[in-house]
Amino acid sequence: MPKPSSSSSSDSPSLTTAKPAGSEVAKKVLPAKATQTVDVSASTSSLSGSKSTTRRSAATGRTSASRATAATPASRGGKSAAGSSGSGSASGGAIKPPASSSVPSFVQGIALGMIETRGMVPAIEAADAMTKAAEVNLISREYVGGGYVTVMVRGETGAVNAAVRAGADACERVGDGLVAAHIIARPHQEVEPALRPTHAKRRS
């Protein structure tokens, strides 16, 4: 009978020693599993934060670009207005007074045609016929005195020749009005001042 007791006592220590080994294995396995877990909430919040900052920066860039485009036409308009005002002021100082319309510009080397009549009516008829017959410019009408009136035209030589002939023919049809008709193909430059109209009133 003493042998079974010894066997039971020898078996019990073996069982008690196996338990601590299992608990140690469990302790070793659990920390390994815990270290493998990942904090997903932190990464998700960081991603959402980066997306929100990206959206905000994109929106800020768009608003700044729109403001720049809106300000550009205004600045251009201001520059153009300033440039126009500056050019106007600069050109305003350089503007020359226009020449008198009553005094035509005499060009040297252009033919001169003259018709002198007795009375005003033949002179008007001659001037009308000359300007209608050819491309000439009526430059002067002078009261000579004693009822004589002189009309002068300028233009190319052929045009002045045709105009004076037409004026003389028209003047002869109005009574005995024609006194003289003459053409100078190229008046001298010293004669030019004498051709300017004097705007003298009718003389008795």
UniProtKB/Swiss-Prot annotation:
Task: Report the source organism.
Answer: Prochlorococcus marinus (strain MIT 9313)
Domain spans labelled BMC: 111-196
Please indicate which superkingdom the organism of origin belongs to.
Bacteria
**Family in the record:** Belongs to the bacterial microcompartments protein family.
Q: What quaternary structure, including any partners, is listed in this protein's UniProt entry?
A: Homohexamer.
A molecular-function term among this protein's GO annotations: structural constituent of carboxysome shell
GO biological-process terms attached to the record: carbon fixation; photosynthesis
- Tell me the function of this protein: A probable carboxysomal shell protein found only in Prochlorococcus and Synechococcus strains that grow in low light.
Instruction: Quote the protein name from its UniProt record.
Output: Probable carboxysome shell protein CsoS1E
Which keywords does UniProt give here? Bacterial microcompartment, Carbon dioxide fixation, Carboxysome, Photosynthesis
Recorded GO CC terms: carboxysome
- Do you know which PROSITE patterns this protein is assigned to? BMC_1 (PS01139), BMC_2 (PS51930)
Q: Which Gene3D superfamilies match?
A: 3.30.70.1710
Record's InterPro entries? Bact_microcomp_CS, BMC_dom, BMC_shell, CcmK-like_sf, CcmK/CsoS1_BMC
Q: Where in the cell is it found?
A: Carboxysome
Q: Disordered: where is this region?
A: 1-102
**Pfam families, per the entry:** BMC
Question: Low complexity bias: where?
Answer: 1-14, 41-84, 92-102
What is the phylogenetic placement of the source species in the record? Bacteria, Bacillati, Cyanobacteriota, Cyanophyceae, Synechococcales
